[in-house]
């Protein structure tokens, strides 16, 4: 083979290499991933950044944001990808308080956000909805597994002149139109005002742990439920809206990255409430770093 031929092949190889590099960089444009300011959101945003980096993307993480700030940043193009909750989008962003089933909520928010250039990908099985919880020993002692069981116990004790049933809720839930009052009406029980203790959400968990409350308002995937050995009560009449965690991406970003939707859907398919509760516990109770917990999950799920 002559030097001229070798040079010719070398130039061809260089051209192919540059073309392939250019293709890789086109996919690997910088993706800005946003997250809210609580543990679950820090985990979701961090695991998304690590996962996409392993797929060849450049990523920038901007988490620790409030709900409305994150939403505004997504709409204005300052963020490319976030994880948001279907119930939040329905009630907070779109001010719809109709009682819809989980699939109806998902379809509604997806439809409403499409004209805004935002695409809701496949929802995960992580439902971080409101939930009432009890100390497990108390729940087992009184055979309470659901909100209807709770209502029946309260009504039975009231007839017998039993002791008060202290319920801990946050300040908003106690008074809002889709809060405590309508829930009591649906399940057919009524607590006296003195039995309803309004407090910071974080204090509810501590009070439940110490059995200072009979029951308290929590979030279904909070790590403290497992860490403090609390019993979640089934919402057997479907009072609370679903808050399914879902990747939301700007449509422009999806168009520039043809495989991104499929890749994020693959991640979403691996996440459910039980899994996230355990991950949240590792951060909040066991004090493990968010980045480590996120990386462990991705490896165990076979995603990286």
Named regions from a protein language model:
Residues 93-121, 210-212, 224-238:
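Ligand-binding "clamshell"
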Residues 104-166, 269-273:
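A conserved helix-loop-strand patch within extracytoplasmic ligand-binding domains
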Residues 160-235:
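Ligand-binding pocket segment of bilobal, Venus flytrap-like solute-binding proteins
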Residues 30-48, 65-67, 172-175:
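Extracytoplasmic "Venus flytrap"
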Residues 39-58, 181-185:
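Short, polar/charged alpha-helical segment
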Residues 40, 172-189, 258-304:
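An extracytoplasmic/periplasmic, membrane-proximal ligand-sensing/linker region
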Residues 130-140, 244-257:
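A bilobed periplasmic-binding-protein/Venus flytrap-type ligand-binding module shared by bacterial periplasmic
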Residues 63-67, 77-89, 105, 201, ...:
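Beta->alpha turn/N-cap motifs
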């Amino acid at each position: 083979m002559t030097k001229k031929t070798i040079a010719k092949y070398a130039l061809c190889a260089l051209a192919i290499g540059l073309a392939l590099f250019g293709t890789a960089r086109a996919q690997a444009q910088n993706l800005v991933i946003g997250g809210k300011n609580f543990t679950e959101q820090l985990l979701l945003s961090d695991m998304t950044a690590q996962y996409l980096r392993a797929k060849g993307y450049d990523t920038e993480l901007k988490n620790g944001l409030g709900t409305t700030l994150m939403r505004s940043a997504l709409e204005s193009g300052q963020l490319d990808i976030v994880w948001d909750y279907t119930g939040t989008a329905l009630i907070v962003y779109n001010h719809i308080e109709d009682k819809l089933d989980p699939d109806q909520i998902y379809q509604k928010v997806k439809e409403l956000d499409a004209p805004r250039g935002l695409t809701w990908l496949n929802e995960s099985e992580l439902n971080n909805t409101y939930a009432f919880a009890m100390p497990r020993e108390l729940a087992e002692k009184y055979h309470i597994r659901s909100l209807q069981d709770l209502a029946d116990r309260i009504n039975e004790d009231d007839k017998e002149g039993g002791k008060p049933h202290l319920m801990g809720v946050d300040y908003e839930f106690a008074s809002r139109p889709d809060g405590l009052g309508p829930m009591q009406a649906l399940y057919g029980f009524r607590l006296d005002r003195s039995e309803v203790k309004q407090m910071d959400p974080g204090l509810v968990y501590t009070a439940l742990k110490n059995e200072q409350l009979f029951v308290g308002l929590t979030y279904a995937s909070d790590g403290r439920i497992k860490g403090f050995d609390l019993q979640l009560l089934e919402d057997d009449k479907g009072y609370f809206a679903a808050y399914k965690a879902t990747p939301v991406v700007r449509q422009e970003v999806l168009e520039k990255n043809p495989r991104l939707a499929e890749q994020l859907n693959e991640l979403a398919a691996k996440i459910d409430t039980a899994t996230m509760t355990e991950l949240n516990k590792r951060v909040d109770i066991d004090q493990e770093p968010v980045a480590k917990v996120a990386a462990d999950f991705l490896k165990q799920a076979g995603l990286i």
